[in-house]
């Protein structure tokens, strides 16, 4: 059976369009009608620069990996027509050594929605109808707010970062960079028992959102003195670096106490002068955090059950046919945190 769909496609720098496509449904997997999707930083990079890092757009590609929808057809008796689902954008191979160890985010042959890492590119979820693996569909109650449920993927990233830090109950936590992911980390660590949460950012608007999401103290490093948090080899048990900026990396290392944990979430470039002696001398455990594994299901559960409320981060919603306008607004960080497309 052939299904016609309308898709949000990027073909290069500042070159996007909503185009009609045809997909073949052969009763394998699950056919989903996409209802809503959040615009991520990678979508913006593909639009603004025609690439993410070294991954350049070489052919038209459907954007988007933060999507939810309703089941149209499925090869599984566990999914029924009309079932509301969040779609996990990860499609690991299932048989490499990392998949076998249940570290699927490290899969050596990962296919991730809306990624130009491979060629042919992997189409994303910004399309009216999408055929996916049944295992990628995570059901949630129909009564749940779809604006909330569309935060499942970024919340999964935040929960995974929180898990990378280890035990958080009673810990003092510092978060540098409170864009959407940083703000969701605030909520995640608070849910997991952090006793004190301090957020740092140079944007007053971002700091205000961090406060709404559960931060106790707000700091602007350009204006506020942080020496008292750096004294005696640092104050915080755990720090999260979420901006990727070198000065933020340095600050996190300075305010993290000896034998504390720093989780690197922000994606930045190489640092010419990384403070190696601070890391070594204070015996800080530096841990990377990349995407998620089982945390996607956790995120769906948290959102469906009202464990956290991400809606303060929702700045605007657009019909998917206004794709370029939505991308332009989402790229204006003086106004936008999270922008969603409605299908």
Curated annotation (Swiss-Prot):
Q: Which GO molecular-function terms appear in the entry? A: L-idonate 5-dehydrogenase (NAD+) activity; L-idonate 5-dehydrogenase [NAD(P)+] activity; metal ion binding
Record keywords: Gluconate utilization, Metal-binding, NADP, Oxidoreductase, Zinc
The family database entries (Pfam families) matched by this protein are listed as: ADH_N, ADH_zinc_N
Details of cofactor binding: Binds 2 Zn(2+) ions per subunit.
| CDD domains reported in the protein's UniProt record | idonate-5-DH
Q: Which GO terms describe its biological process?
A: D-gluconate metabolic process; L-idonate catabolic process
Q: What class of enzyme is it?
A: oxidoreductase
Catalytic activities = L-idonate + NADP(+) = 5-dehydro-D-gluconate + NADPH + H(+); L-idonate + NAD(+) = 5-dehydro-D-gluconate + NADH + H(+)
Pathway field:
Carbohydrate acid metabolism; L-idonate degradation
As for what it does, the entry says:
Catalyzes the NADH/NADPH-dependent oxidation of L-idonate to 5-ketogluconate (5KG).
Q: What is this protein called?
A: L-idonate 5-dehydrogenase (NAD(P)(+))
Q: Which gene encodes it?
A: idnD
